[in-house]
């Protein structure tokens, strides 16, 4: 076999974790030049003999998606062609479908979906609440500068509570009466000295954290009544809230903050670092140094990996659990301008989404560094924020004054979202 040209045959075992698509566990001799298309034909022919209908598969060879010829993939991994190769096949994740375009009056810099609602924040200083079917419910004034981040605290049929942060140096706590469709600002959270770019609510909904251009990380009570010590009677009466904890360690703006668990926070910064904070000790637990300013970061509770978005068009993957956290596990190539926003799926271990100044969203599998699974098109200008908190919807906001809503697989499979 002339392996230099990828000619001849390779012995492979075809495996799947989806038992209903399993084929006989025997070695198969296939041509070294096969691609995903030919492997699909081969596996479907085997399944057809079992009475199965045609299915689109993707193929993993040594934990990475096959994106070209098998022989080229093996050479790149320095795998001997004489070895029996295990190829795992998985049902291809279906392309998300565009559902809605929600028109705003200014740039949409913050989005967060929960249940049947979508919360947005804009550069005209307003918040907006929409249904996930595209109906506008409420416009909420209050901030005096562009809004940079939003997050839901709690939500049920009667009441919604959420937090917003802004370039006006504040975060604001809100309570929404769903039935009456009225909103009250519960507290104005003051303590930062520059704009507040990021906000994240704790898993139990009792606290939230903010990151700012003043380089500080602050933790606040998210309770309706802030009974903490040190809050003056005058501040309580005026609705002003002060932070419970202030943590210093970054040298430049904190662009991302996320709760990893009830007592651990992740931050990303323009100072090229990720930091993991232990709130019980009120200090830094771990630090990951990168070589680029971090515009956004996302931690997955499913796989414990961290993604970063940066100005060099690339996304990077880090492992927070190792002593070699600063070593890049993978780099994802596909955007043509700086990547502003990234988020892991909350239900699919390997999937994440990103949004970029190239006007595009992309859906990725972390095992496919060379290309995204899909481009999610629709924005006419820069993408500023993306959210996949609700497994049914990928939601993004942009400088084209729109929010784009895409149905994900969960919504497509359940067929619950016809207008």
Curated annotation (Swiss-Prot):
Record carries keyword Acetylation: no
Record-stated family: Belongs to the WD repeat WDR12/YTM1 family.
Top-rank lineage group of the source organism: Eukaryota
Family annotation (PROSITE patterns): WD_REPEATS_1, WD_REPEATS_2, WD_REPEATS_REGION
Transmembrane segments: none
Biological processes per GO annotation: maturation of 5.8S rRNA from tricistronic rRNA transcript (SSU-rRNA, 5.8S rRNA, LSU-rRNA); maturation of LSU-rRNA from tricistronic rRNA transcript (SSU-rRNA, 5.8S rRNA, LSU-rRNA)
The WD repeat ranges on this chain: 103-141, 142-184, 191-230, 249-287, 289-328, 334-374, 378-416
GO annotations of cellular component type: nucleoplasm; PeBoW complex; preribosome, large subunit precursor
Name listed for the protein in its UniProt record: Ribosome biogenesis protein WDR12 homolog
Principal localisation: nucleus
NAD keyword on record: no
Region (Ubiquitin-like (UBL) domain): 10-91
Record GO terms (molecular function): ribonucleoprotein complex binding
CDD domains, per database record: WD40 (cd00200)
Functional summary from the UniProt entry: Required for maturation of ribosomal RNAs and formation of the large ribosomal subunit.
Lineage: Eukaryota, Metazoa, Ecdysozoa, Arthropoda, Hexapoda
Keywords: Nucleus, Repeat, Ribosome biogenesis, rRNA processing, WD repeat
Xref: SMART domains: WD40
Subcellular location: Nucleus, Nucleolus; Nucleus, Nucleoplasm
């Amino acid at each position: 076999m002339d392996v230099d040209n990828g000619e001849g045959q390779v012995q492979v075992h075809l495996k799947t974790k989806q038992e209903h698509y399993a084929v006989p566990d025997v070695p198969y001799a296939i041509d070294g030049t096969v691609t995903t298309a030919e492997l699909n034909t081969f596996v479907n022919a085997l399944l057809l003999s079992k009475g199965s209908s045609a299915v689109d598969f993707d193929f993993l060879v040594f934990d990475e998606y096959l994106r070209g010829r098998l022989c080229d993939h093996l050479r790149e991994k320095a795998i001997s062609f004489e070895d029996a190769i295990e190829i795992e096949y998985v049902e291809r994740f279906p392309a998300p479908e565009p559902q809605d375009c929600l028109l705003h009056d200014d740039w949409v810099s913050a989005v967060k979906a929960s249940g049947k609602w979508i919360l947005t924040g804009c550069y005209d200083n307003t918040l907006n609440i929409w249904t996930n079917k595209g109906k506008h419910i409420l416009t909420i004034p209050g901030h005096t500068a562009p809004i940079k981040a939003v997050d839901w605290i709690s939500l049920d049929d009667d009441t919604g509570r959420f937090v917003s942060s802004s370039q006006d140096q504040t975060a604001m706590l809100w309570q929404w009466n769903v039935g009456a469709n009225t909103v009250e600002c519960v507290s104005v959270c003051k303590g930062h000295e520059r704009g507040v770019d990021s906000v994240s609510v704790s898993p139990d909904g009792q606290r939230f954290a903010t990151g700012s251009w003043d380089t500080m990380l602050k933790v606040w009570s998210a309770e309706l009544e802030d009974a903490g010590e040190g809050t003056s009677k005058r501040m309580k009466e005026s609705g002003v809230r002060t932070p419970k904890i202030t943590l210093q360690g970054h040298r430049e703006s904190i662009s991302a903050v996320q709760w990893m668990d009830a007592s651990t926070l992740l931050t990303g910064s323009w100072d090229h670092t990720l930091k993991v904070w232990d709130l019980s000790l009120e200090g830094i637990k771990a630090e990951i140094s990168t070589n680029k300013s971090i515009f956004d970061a996302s931690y997955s509770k499913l796989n414990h990996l961290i993604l970063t978005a940066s100005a060099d068009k690339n996304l990077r993957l880090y492992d927070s659990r190792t002593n070699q956290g600063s070593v890049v596990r993978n780099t994802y190539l596909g955007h043509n301008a700086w990547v502003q926003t990234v988020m892991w799926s909350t239900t699919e271990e390997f999937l994440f989404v990103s949004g970029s100044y190239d006007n595009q969203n992309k859906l990725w599998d972390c095992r496919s560094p060379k290309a995204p699974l899909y481009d999610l098109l629709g924005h006419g200008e820069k993408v500023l924020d993306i959210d996949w908190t609700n497994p049914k919807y990928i939601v993004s906001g942009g400088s084209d004054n729109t929010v784009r809503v895409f149905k994900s697989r969960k919504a497509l499979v359940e067929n619950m979202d016809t207008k």
